[in-house]
Regions:
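An N-terminus-focused feature that recognizes amino-terminal "leader" regions
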Residues: 2-69
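Compact, glycine/acidic-enriched structural inserts
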Residues: 279-309
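N-terminal segments that cap or nucleate solenoid repeat domains
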Residues: 311-355
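Conserved hydrophobic beta-strand positions in leucine-rich repeat
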Residues: 317-320, 339-344, 362-368, 387-389, ...
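Hydrophobic anchor residues at the C-terminal helix/turn of individual leucine-rich repeat
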Residues: 332, 356, 378, 400-401
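Inter-repeat linker/turn residues at the boundaries of leucine-rich repeats
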Residues: 336, 357-360, 370, 379-382, ...
Length: 454
C-alpha cells in the first residue's frame, strides 16, 4: 500500500511551517515595535516543545502531526527549528537536524550539548570505588541463619553447586559474600517460564530475585543520562557514609529488584558501612545508592532501615551557583573542593574568573551571556571538561584560539539576538575536535507585516 505520510523533503518548504510559526507568534509585540521577533522549538516523532502558552489550534496541531508523520517516514527522530521574523514579515527559518555529536537536552531548544570526545563521561561516572580492605560484615550477617530460613521457606528449591557459584565469581571478577553464596545454595533460580516459582522465591527473599547466571555489577556508564545533566552533578563520600558516592562499582552486585529499582550487595562499602550490606540503586537517579539493610540476612528477615541515606546531591562545596538569588561573588564559591560553577543572570558588573585560578577539581563552568568580564580567563583553567557560554563569549575564545582542549563536551547558551548563527558557531567548536558537522537547513519565507493592536 502506498505510504500516505508526507515525505521528509516536505519539511524544506516554508509553507509547511507557516501554521506553527503563526501560532508561536500569536501575542508577540516585538514586530509591532519595529523589532524582529524570534521563536524556537523542537518537534519529534513522539512529542513537541513549542514556546506557546495554551493549547494548540486545530490547524497548528494538524500541521505538527503532519510533521511528525514526515519524520517517521524519513526515520528521523526529531527536528529543531528557530525563526527570525522581521517587522515586514520576511522570515528566516533554520532547521537543525539530529547529529550523532549532539545530545538533545532540556534548555537547548535548537541544539543540545556538543559531545567533543566520543564516548566520554563526566568525571563522577568515571570514579572508581576506594578500596575497603578493613570492611567487615555487620554483626547481623549470619549465612547459616539465612540459609536455614530460606530452606524452610523454599523446601523444594534447587540450589547452585559450589562449582556454579565459583563460575559466577569468575565471571564477575569478585568474591561473593558468604551470605550471597548461602542464598544461591538454596535457590540457583533458573525459571524457564516458571512464574509461580519465581513468585515463591520472590516472596521468600523479599524482592524479584535474579538468577545466579544473571548476577551483574552495577555499571556506571549505563546510569549516565547525558552531559547536559551529568556535567552539573557531583557526589562525595562523607567520612561516616555507609555507601560510597559513586555511579556504579564492580563491587555493587545486583541480585534483584522491586520492579524498577535495583537491589545490590555492596562489596565496597563506605567508611561507615559493612561488607555485604544491601543497597538500593534508584532507577530515577543517575548517581549514588541508598543503604536499605546492614546485611543480606537483615534484608531477607525484613529488618530493613526505615530512614535511608547515602546519596549526596548538588550541595556545596562541590557545586556552586553565582548570580541573582544565589551567591553574589566568585570569591565566595571558590575553594579547593569546587567542581561545578554556574553563573546565572546578574544585574551587577560582570564577574572576573580570577578567583578560580588554580582550583584543582574545577571541571564544569557555565556562564549566562554578559556575565563574564573577560572570557579569555577561561584559557587558564587546565581541568575543564564541560563549558557552556553565550555566543559572544564563545566568539572571543574561538578568535583567540583559546578554547580549552581538555573539554569533552560543550554547550552554547542562546539569548534572543543570537538565534540563527548558533549552528555555525557550534560547527566551529566541533571542528577543533574533528567531529562531524551539524546539518542546518535555512529557508526564506514571508509571514506578512505585523498587525498593530488598536
Amino acid at each position: 500500500m502506498e505510504d500516505q505520510r508526507p515525505p521528509l523533503s516536505w519539511l524544506d518548504a516554508f509553507e509547511t511551517w507557516e501554521p506553527v510559526l503563526r501560532l508561536m507568534l500569536a501575542g508577540e509585540t516585538e514586530r509591532a515595535a519595529a523589532r524582529p521577533a524570534r521563536v524556537a522549538g523542537r518537534i519529534s516523532q513522539y512529542g513537541w516543545s513549542l514556546a506557546h502558552r495554551g493549547s494548540l489550534s486545530a490547524t497548528a496541531r494538524t500541521r505538527v502531526e503532519d510533521i511528525q508523520r514526515a519524520l517517521a517516514r524519513g526515520k528521523v527522530q526529531e527536528v529543531a527549528f528557530r525563526a527570525e521574523v522581521r517587522p515586514d514579515g520576511r522570515t528566516t527559518l533554520g532547521l537543525v537536524w539530529p547529529s550523532p555529536v549532539v545530545e538533545p537536552a532540556v534548555g537547548y531548544p535548537d541544539l543540545g550539548v556538543l559531545v567533543l570526545a566520543e564516548g566520554s563521561l563526566p568525571e563522577p561516572w568515571l570514579r572508581r570505588p576506594d578500596p575497603a580492605p578493613e570492611a567487615v560484615p555487620a554483626p547481623s550477617a549470619d549465612p547459616e541463619l539465612l540459609e536455614r530460613t530460606l530452606r524452610e521457606r523454599l523446601p523444594d528449591a534447587v540450589g547452585a553447586t559450589a562449582e556454579e557459584i565459583a563460575a559466577a565469581e569468575a565471571r564477575l571478577g569478585v568474591a561473593l559474600s558468604d551470605e550471597l553464596k548461602a542464598l544461591y545454595r538454596v535457590a540457583r533460580v533458573d525459571w524457564r517460564g516458571d512464574f509461580e516459582g519465581a513468585d515463591r522465591v520472590g516472596d521468600a527473599v523479599g524482592c524479584e530475585l535474579s538468577g545466579l547466571d544473571d548476577l551483574y555489577a552495577v555499571d556506571a556508564e549505563r546510569r549516565h543520562s547525558g552531559w547536559g545533566h551529568g556535567a552539573m552533578r557531583a557526589l562525595s563520600t562523607a567520612p561516616d557514609a555507609a555507601v560510597q558516592g559513586l555511579a556504579g562499582s564492580p563491587g555493587w552486585i545486583g541480585f534483584g529488584s522491586n520492579g524498577g529499582d535495583e537491589f545490590a550487595v555492596d562489596l565496597n562499602p563506605g567508611p561507615g558501612g559493612h561488607f555485604g550490606q544491601v543497597i538500593l540503586v534508584d532507577h530515577e537517579q543517575s548517581l549514588g545508592a541508598e543503604l536499605v539493610a546492614d546485611s543480606l540476612t537483615d534484608f531477607v528477615l525484613g529488618r530493613r532501615r526505615e530512614e535511608r541515606g547515602g546519596r549526596r546531591g548538588n550541595t556545596l562545596p562541590a557545586v556552586a551557583k553565582v548570580g541573582s538569588g544565589f551567591l553574589e561573588t566568585i570569591e565566595t564559591a571558590a575553594h579547593g573542593a569546587l567542581e561545578v560553577l554556574s553563573i546565572g543572570a546578574w544585574d551587577g558588573a560582570p564577574f572576573s574568573l580570577a578567583p578560580l585560578a588554580g582550583l584543582p577539581r574545577l571541571r564544569t563552568l557555565t556562564a549566562a551571556p554578559g556575565t563574564l568580564a573577560d572570557p579569555l580567563e577561561i584559557a587558564g583553567f587546565s581541568g575543564l571538561e564541560f563549558l557552556e557560554l553565550g555566543v559572544r563569549d564563545w566568539r572571543v575564545l574561538l578568535d583567540a584560539r583559546a578554547v580549552p582542549r581538555t573539554l569533552k563536551a560543550a554547550a552554547i547558551k542562546v539569548r534572543d539576538q543570537d538565534h540563527l548563527p548558533v549552528a555555525a558557531l557550534a560547527n566551529e567548536i566541533l571542528a577543533l575536535w574533528d567531529r562531524p558537522q551539524i546539518a542546518q537547513t535555512l529557508i526564506q519565507g514571508d509571514l506578512g507585516p505585523a498587525t498593530t493592536a488598536r
